[in-house]
From Swiss-Prot:
Catalysed reaction, written as an equation: (2R,3R)-tartrate(out) + succinate(in) = (2R,3R)-tartrate(in) + succinate(out)
One Pfam family here: Na_sulph_symp
Annotated keywords: Antiport, Cell inner membrane, Cell membrane, Membrane, Transmembrane, Transmembrane helix, Transport
Induction line: Induced by tartrate, via TtdR.
UniProt name for this protein: L-tartrate/succinate antiporter
Localization, UniProt: Cell inner membrane
Family: Belongs to the SLC13A/DASS transporter (TC 2.A.47) family. DIT1 subfamily.
Amino acid sequence: MKPSTEWWRYLAPLAVIAIIALLPVPAGLENHTWLYFAVFTGVIVGLILEPVPGAVVAMVGISIIAILSPWLLFSPEQLAQPGFKFTAKSLSWAVSGFSNSVIWLIFAAFMFGTGYEKTGLGRRIALILVKKMGHRTLFLGYAVMFSELILAPVTPSNSARGAGIIYPIIRNLPPLYQSQPNDSSSRSIGSYIMWMGIVADCVTSAIFLTAMAPNLLLIGLMKSASHATLSWGDWFLGMLPLSILLVLLVPWLAYVLYPPVLKSGDQVPRWAETELQAMGPLCSREKRMLGLMVGALVLWIFGGDYIDAAMVGYSVVALMLLLRIISWDDIVSNKAAWNVFFWLASLITLATGLNNTGFISWFGKLLAGSLSGYSPTMVMVALIVVFYLLRYFFASATAYTSALAPMMIAAALAMPEIPLPVFCLMVGAAIGLGSILTPYATGPSPIYYGSGYLPTADYWRLGAIFGLIFLVLLVITGLLWMPVVLL
């Protein structure tokens, strides 16, 4: 696309800000709160349209608010307080997101992913599973699922995991059986494998807190709005029954609903064995990496009372440097990690301002009035269903979470009977599971969709079927199990 045709992407966020700012201030809101909301909405529109990278959009929004803080961030009463210096206060607010523990947890998890990639451990694990389970097509589907499952806790970029590690391996498998893309032979085995690749990525993105960056963004938004939070262990235990069910059910379900013509064969295990032989035996760096990852997972699950999850990640990264699993250059050159670090911190800052200015509490009270008369369970389920289905309108999980999660949290806070930890975990699971709905919902989706093995009609049909199944199972486990372990 030529730059001359992109001007509207730059103007649209500014137009949204201007339109909202010029509208009458709703009853119950202060003028500065409404102006803040106008800029916040403009940032969300910018994240959706992306005239520049998302991190830049968020940083520009923060800069505008901080510079104009006497009119956007602080009330007249705050400004009138003796000794109140808005310049210092606005700077403190602008950088507050960078001190959030969630930011450092996800940054550490990115470094874990770098360790997996640098040592080759992630590729080795996937190849071993393919070798052991690849004799039957159904078991090959489970090998793809288990590969994603093992990598997910320490790979917070589902794009890096699905498109960067898993896809380059499984794209080599169909041609071994003469299953070619954009050909009638694609249904032989290739279509099943590619569908398993994207559906496994979506499932594992919901299972672990650190499996997808928007999961951590949600926790940051939750904490800024309510001071409540969910630990890594809380998320894992709350998702446990649904996780087990999906991991065991999905490969079989895909096998039934999108059956491959070829049911078994020996070519895939032979290829995997050849690749493993080329890699050689497990080296000392891989062993050290494996030991550190096991230790981190144990502390994340069981060590919450003794050490913060972010501190676990921070310490493990330090050990990875000392043990020369990764180098300092690997850290400073990791563009993906720094990109997520900046946009996630900036979005948490913006969400904190939305709460500090009083917008969240006002919106919550507004919703409380409209939702009165309905049971908390009915409201919670209705909100989850609406949140889930709105995934169709977003091509970015980050924009989706940034735009809708604050409103969902405000709605839950408006009804004290709704258990916030349970509701937020259901919202978090919906982010990952709902990514299966469309071929543009998350980073790996276009990769698998463009593989030539998943025709458009098949993708949309399967996305709707699997999406509905995921939603039903999420609601059931959310109502029956999550309150048991989270409340």
